[in-house]
């Protein structure tokens, strides 16, 4: 009798494991990882989660959280966008040409242009037709009362084609906000971006990579990386350490400044997100506490902001 019970339990656990593994491969690996565009995860996140935590939020970034002074996701998102803009040197300058690669829904471009001279132009590209359509519709809505955004050009474009698309144009500033870790060839993107800069141009990037002390021997780290790389469509070649990322960046640009802001991004983002989502769903608060702590304690990524200038390759 005891033997039969053991066999039954083992069989049940095996069935559960196979079912869970099958569901993971069907839902995560097939639906998210194998899409021709890496944007389905963001559309899903925005519709199912972000709108619950921060209604009307069109940003797709972790934000920059300043201790207790940042209390909402929208504030954190704006903090990050304002921070990189202030590093760009675009303030009070005329006729500046800006390229935003991986613009998503274009929220940052609308915010940046409010602080720019009307003679400037922002070219914003993304691989997602749906997200570009959304951005263009927002431009049209804004222009119903004013022409303040007429110099923002949203277009669908694959990152691998940017050098060909803009071969007769040079940019004073190129932004890459939380997008480069998705690209099949991030190193090539860096090289192409450098080619598109004016002689005094700047490249400003916020990006995600593995922590230097990441260990594949830790099962929870490995599980976290596996899930996130599948869900957010991160190619295996981009799962490199922060030090390796620094070298990759320096091979393409003159790097002026690199800031590790991991402590001001992932941790506070996960705690706020989990608490707010659980609270808005009217579930017990301890669930948000547990989920937030789990993500904070197990996430293996670093978050860096870099300010670069054009490198003249011989």
Q: Can you say where each PLM-predicted feature lies in the sequence?
A:
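A short acidic, Gly/Pro-enriched loop at the edge of an enzyme's catalytic core
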Residues: 163-174
């Amino acid at each position: 009798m005891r033997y039969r019970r053991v066999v039954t339990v083992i069989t049940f656990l095996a069935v559960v494991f196979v079912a869970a593994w099958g569901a993971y491969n069907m839902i995560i690996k097939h639906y998210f990882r194998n899409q021709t565009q890496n944007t389905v995860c963001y559309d899903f996140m925005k519709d199912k989660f972000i709108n619950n935590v921060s209604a009307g939020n069109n940003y797709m970034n972790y934000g920059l959280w300043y201790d207790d002074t940042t209390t909402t996701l929208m504030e954190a998102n704006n903090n990050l966008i304002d921070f990189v803009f202030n590093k760009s040197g675009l303030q009070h300058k005329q006729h500046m040409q800006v390229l935003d690669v991986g613009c998503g829904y274009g929220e940052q471009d609308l915010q940046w242009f409010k602080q720019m001279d009307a003679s400037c132009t922002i070219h914003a590209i993304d691989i997602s037709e749906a997200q570009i359509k959304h951005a263009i519709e927002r431009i049209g809505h804004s222009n119903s009362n004013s022409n303040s955004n007429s110099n923002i050009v949203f277009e669908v474009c694959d990152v691998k084609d940017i050098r060909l698309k803009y071969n007769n144009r040079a940019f004073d500033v190129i932004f890459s906000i939380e997008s480069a870790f998705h690209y099949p060839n991030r190193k090539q993107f860096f090289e192409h971006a450098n080619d598109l800069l004016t002689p005094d141009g700047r490249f400003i990037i916020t990006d995600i990579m593995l922590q230097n002390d990441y260990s594949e021997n830790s099962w929870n780290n490995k599980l976290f990386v596996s899930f996130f790389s599948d869900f957010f469509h991160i190619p295996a070649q981009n799962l490199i350490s922060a030090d390796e990322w620094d070298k990759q960046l320096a091979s393409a640009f003159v790097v002026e400044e690199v800031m590790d802001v991991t402590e001001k991004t992932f941790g506070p983002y996960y705690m706020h997100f989990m608490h707010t989502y659980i609270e808005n769903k009217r579930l017990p608060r301890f669930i948000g506490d547990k989920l937030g702590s789990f993500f904070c304690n197990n996430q293996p990524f670093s978050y860096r902001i870099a300010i670069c200038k054009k490198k003249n390759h011989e």
